[in-house]
Amino acid sequence: PGDRGFGITATGTKARRDLHGYSTVAVDPNVIPLGTKLYVEGYGYAIAEDTGGAVRGNIIDLYFEPGSNEFKRWFTHNTTVYILK
């Protein structure tokens, strides 16, 4: 949190959880290109804006606001992800 780049994605946007719009997710850009819009069952609409060290293959990383307890039910979770056109 003290890092100036904290919360800034690989695409240069600020990471966000938007319950009424598109939230940030991290993806493997070799599988899902950055900028791709997605629908994640149980999470909502998202846009692939970031990457991560543990995000490989069909693994994605959902963004949650710091201090939110929402992540607890998603810590390790399998769900369906739809790529939107």
Predicted regions, residues:
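Solvent-exposed, well-ordered loop and adjacent helix/strand elements within mature globular domains
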Residues: 1-85
